[in-house]
Structures are given as structure tokens and as C-alpha cells.
């Protein structure tokens, strides 16, 4: 499904555009990490999409960073990823041996003024952005009744394993609300991989995974007829419209399913809020940062490493197989994604805050 030539052309064009828009680094390789170990920290458990993403990039960074250091992925899960982000905020390592990978689950508490947040994105130095997608799926007994809308599935009671309503799970939970589904989230899991395990054990009957985790761990379930995909969240086209995710062109986007489901509206403040957090959580979802104290020389070294990596002929194919069909941004493109990820309109923010209070009793104080 993911091997068609058209989408390979899209990937190549997207990657070419990203590289063309990046900041030129010139001879930035005066910095050298020979003999050193780079810790690539992600604030999640090792079973989810962020782990797959980090483990894809770690060996490539080792190959392309000056001095070919060892790059090791470290996991610091807790408090919906805010614990790891708070830890990173306090780090003073400035020599390039520490990088941090965030996700929408880290961006959302920041956007919503979560009191657990003691980190400031504007203090950090972004060196890569990765867009991604997500797929919602059902067990076979419900999946066989799904025909492009949820009209016949609204009377079902759903259980969903969630990291928390202010994490990246905000996007599916708000989508479920707009669709009119009765979904009871089981809060407290450490990563989306734990949500998938709940689904596999029959403890949850609706789930979603980001693209990398879906390709790795859910596609085998689909092939064994143990799971049925319902929709992807979609992707943004050049004009900012939601279209089908190029990694899953055969799946309807959430917008299509919403339009087909009675009572679900694709206009108004509810839709605007969902789209705003979808953009922050998926179109600009994953970002790699250096601590704020890193020098421009270190930033340039990482930018050059990612530019060289993306320019390799095999990168598009390998990244498609592991991460899906999404551009990787460096330089100016990474900065633009960083701005998208940490920006939300007051109206969308207030809608989400009101919804969190009314449906889950969550207030940001």
C-alpha cells in the first residue's frame, strides 16, 4: 500500500523543498564529537511512536555527526512527558552530547498552561522537525460495522487507554467527542504502546497510534484480522487544508468521517480547536532540541548532520518504511515547525479548556 511511485515522488519533492529551505551551515564541522556519547532523551516509555522515531534517527546521527559519536536513546517517562521536559529544562550540557525529542504530548501541556510545566520551549534550540500522522482502529466486531461513518456505532461503550487528556491524546479524545462517541478513557498509561497492549488484551476497544508505531505494531494486527483501521487524522496540504494522509491514502481522513457522521461538524469553534491541536500535535509533532546553552557552532553541526542525512539517496525509502511519508525539517523549516507547535489561538485554547473542565473535571491552575 505504501510503495506506490506517486508517493515516492511526493516524498522526494517534500524532502528537496525542506533542504532547500534550510539554513546554510557552511563549514560548521569545527565541532567534533569523536569518542563521545550523545544521549538522545525522549520523555516517554520505550514502547511507543516516539521510541520508534528516536531509534530510527539515533544510528543515522552517529553516522553523520562530526566525529561519529555513539548515540544512545534514553527514556524518561512520567507525568504525560512533562517530567522529562522539566528535567531537560534544567540541563546545562552545551557541547552537543545531549539532545531532547518532544512530541505533541509535551507541546499540549505547554499550550494549555498546565501547572506541571516548568519548561520553556523558547529557551531551547531546535535542530529537526518531523511531521507524523495517526490512525484510529477498532476490534473486528466493531470494525466490520464501520462503513465510513459512526452513525451505527454511537450506542457502543468504548474504553480507551490514555496518557492523559492534556497529552497528545487530546486529539483523539476531542475527535471522539465531535463524533458523538461514548468513550471512557482509562488515564495513567505511560505511552501509546501501553494503549495498544490494552487493546490487544481486550481491555480497550478503540485505540490510535502515531504512524511509526502503527506501521511497526498495528499493521501486523490488521494483517491477522485482529484490528480494523477506521480513519487517519489526515495531513495538511500546501493551503492548510486537511487531506488524506499520504502514508495511508486508502483510509479516510477524520474530516471525511466527521462529514459523513450525523451531528459532527467541520466548521465552528469545536472544529477549529481540533484542527489547531492536530497541527501542533501531528503536522509539527516531533522536534529535536539542544539545550539553550548550546553554541551556534553546535547547532550548525547538528543542522549539517541532518541535512547530509536527508540528502542520502536511501533516506526517503527508509524513512517511509519506518516513519511514513512526511517531510523532515531542518534550519528554517524546523524553526517554522517549532513556531507552529507552540502556538494556539485564544479561542481554540479556551474551547479546549472548557471541554476539559466539563468532560473530565480538569482545570489548569
Label for each model-derived stretch:
Residues 17-28:
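C-terminal segment of classical bacterial N-terminal signal peptides
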Residues 31-38, 63-68, 87-98, 110-203, ...:
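Hinge/capping helix and adjacent helix->loop/strand transition within the periplasmic-binding protein
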Residues 234-241, 254, 311, 315-340:
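Mature extracytoplasmic/periplasmic domains
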Residues 40-57, 78-80, 161-167:
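Extracytoplasmic "Venus flytrap"
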Residues 313, 329-365:
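Extracellular/periplasmic bilobal clamshell ligand-binding domains
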Residues 218-310, 347, 355-365:
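C-terminal lobe and pocket-closing loops
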Residues 2-14, 23:
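Bacterial N-terminal signal peptides that target proteins for export
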Residues 77, 161-260:
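Ligand-binding pocket segment of bilobal, Venus flytrap-like solute-binding proteins
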Amino acid at each position: 500500500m505504501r510503495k506506490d511511485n506517486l508517493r515516492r515522488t511526493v516524498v522526494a519533492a517534500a524532502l528537496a523543498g525542506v533542504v532547500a529551505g534550510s539554513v546554510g551551515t557552511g563549514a560548521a564541522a569545527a565541532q567534533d564529537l569523536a569518542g563521545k556519547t550523545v544521549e538522545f532523551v525522549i520523555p516517554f516509555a520505550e514502547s511507543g511512536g516516539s521510541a520508534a522515531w528516536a531509534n530510527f534517527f539515533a544510528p543515522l546521527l552517529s553516522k553523520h555527526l562530526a566525529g561519529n559519536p555513539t548515540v544512545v536513546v534514553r527514556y524518561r517517562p512520567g507525568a504525560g512527558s512533562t517530567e522529562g521536559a522539566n528535567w531537560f529544562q534544567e540541563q546545562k550540557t552545551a557541547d552537543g552530547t545531549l539532545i531532547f525529542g518532544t512530541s505533541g504530548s509535551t507541546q499540549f501541556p505547554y499550550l494549555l498552561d498546565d501547572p506541571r510545566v516548568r519548561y520553556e520551549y523558547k529557551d531551547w534550540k531546535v535542530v529537526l522537525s518531523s511531521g507524523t500522522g495517526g490512525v484510529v482502529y477498532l476490534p473486528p466486531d466493531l470494525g466490520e460495522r464501520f462503513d465510513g461513518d459512526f452513525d451505527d456505532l454511537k450506542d457502543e461503550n468504548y474504553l480507551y487507554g490514555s496518557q492523559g487528556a492534556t497529552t497528545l491524546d487530546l486529539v483523539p479524545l476531542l475527535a471522539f467527542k465531535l463524533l458523538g462517541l461514548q468513550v471512557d478513557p482509562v488515564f495513567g498509561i505511560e505511552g501509546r504502546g501501553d494503549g495498544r497492549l490494552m487493546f490487544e488484551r481486550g481491555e480497550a476497544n478503540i485505540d490510535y497510534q502515531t504512524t511509526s508505531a502503527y506501521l511497526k505494531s498495528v499493521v501486523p494486527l490488521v494483517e491477522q484480522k485482529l484490528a480494523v483501521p477506521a480513519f487517519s487524522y489526515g495531513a495538511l496540504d500546501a493551503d492548510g487544508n486537511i487531506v488524506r494522509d499520504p502514508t495511508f491514502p486508502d483510509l479516510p481522513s477524520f474530516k471525511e468521517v466527521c462529514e459523513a457522521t450525523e451531528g459532527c461538524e467541520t466548521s465552528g469553534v469545536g472544529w477549529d480547536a481540533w484542527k489547531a491541536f492536530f497541527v501542533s500535535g501531528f503536522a509539527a509533532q516531533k522536534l529535536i532540541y539542544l539545550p539553550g546553552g548550546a553554541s551556534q557552532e553546535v547547532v550548525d553541526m547538528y543542522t549539517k548532520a541532518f541535512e547530509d542525512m536527508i540528502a542520502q539517496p536511501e533516506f526517503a525509502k527508509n524513512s517511509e518504511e519506518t516513519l511514513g511519508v512526511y517531510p523532515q525539517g531542518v534550519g528554517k523549516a524546523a524553526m517554522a515547525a517549532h513556531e507552529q507547535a507552540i502556538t494556539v489561538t485564544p479561542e481554540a485554547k479556551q474551547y479546549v479548556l472548557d471541554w476539559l473542565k466539563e468532560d473530565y473535571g480538569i482545570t489548569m491552575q
